[in-house]
């Protein structure tokens, strides 16, 4: 808040992003809410990238905005502290990275489509869930959401323009335009509180289900795998959420979904991590 008040420019890097990334620190350091706090600061541009090319595009854009265009903004970027492969940047995704969302991987199939969205460390869980679902004949595509905050701000700006023009101008939010190019229910999973990704619910294309997974509750000291299982943001819970939404819309039978329970180790009697 002090940086915003002083009109600072620069990059603030949160190097222990997410509730499950810095495992073993428990209540002391696990962060599931900093992006929500960042959203309260008007001149703070925040991102939760996963891959090195996303970070590069964001930093390049920040340098241009702050030091070439002289915009009075500063950046809050969360980074991770675990080792994983970093792919080459797909073609044509720069604008999506800057604005907050792009399709990382489109399913080759078309049967039972579902859209999986993720950010930060949990994007890799989302990618693993998509692979499992594809093996089950589910056309699961993956979206990288670099900034739910920026998507929300864009959506609110579009709503404001429509309001003040009495409907004469009705710009479409960027996230709406992107997701309209897909079909099926949408599942979002992040390493932050559910409220972070739930911000864009008003801008989900009409008639589409939107299921949000997040890390509400106090941090714990454990392995990353155990923490993600505890907060229900591991790949198994992402896959289960996709199956549940497909069942609700009638494209997956209840019996077929129930057959997944043992395979994914989904416990219906598990205590809610928000209170446990």
Task: List where the protein language model places each region.
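Long, structured ligand/cofactor-binding scaffold of large enzymes
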Residues: 1-4
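Thiamine diphosphate
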Residues: 10, 16, 20-31, 39, ...
């Amino acid at each position: 808040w002090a940086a915003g008040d002083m009109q600072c420019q620069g990059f603030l890097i949160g190097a222990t992003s997410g509730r499950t990334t810095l495992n073993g620190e428990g209540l002391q350091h696990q962060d599931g809410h900093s992006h929500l706090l960042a959203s309260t600061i008007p001149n703070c541009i925040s991102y939760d990238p996963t891959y090195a090319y996303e970070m590069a595009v964001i930093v390049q854009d920040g340098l241009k905005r702050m030091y070439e265009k002289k915009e009075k903004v500063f950046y809050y970027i969360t980074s991770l502290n675990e080792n994983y492969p970093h792919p080459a940047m797909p073609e044509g995704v720069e604008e999506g990275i800057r604005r907050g969302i792009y399709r990382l991987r489109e399913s080759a199939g078309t049967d039972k489509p579902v859209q999986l969205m993720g950010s930060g460390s949990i994007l890799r869980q989302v990618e693993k869930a998509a692979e499992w679902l594809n093996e089950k004949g589910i056309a699961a595509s993956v979206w990288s959401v670099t900034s739910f905050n920026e998507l929300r701000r864009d959506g609110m700006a579009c709503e404001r323009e429509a309001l003040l023009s009495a409907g004469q101008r009705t710009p479409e939010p960027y996230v709406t335009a992107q997701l309209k190019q897909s079909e099926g229910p949408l599942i979002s999973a992040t390493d932050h509180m559910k409220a972070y990704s739930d911000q864009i619910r008003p801008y989900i294309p009409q008639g589409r289900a939107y299921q949000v997974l997040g890390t509400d509750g106090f941090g714990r000291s454990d392995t990353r795998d155990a923490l993600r299982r505890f907060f229900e943001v591991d790949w198994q819970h992402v896959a289960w959420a996709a199956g549940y939404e497909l069942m609700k819309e009638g494209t997956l039978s209840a019996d077929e979904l129930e057959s997944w329970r043992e395979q994914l180790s989904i416990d219906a009697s598990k205590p809610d991590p928000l209170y446990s």
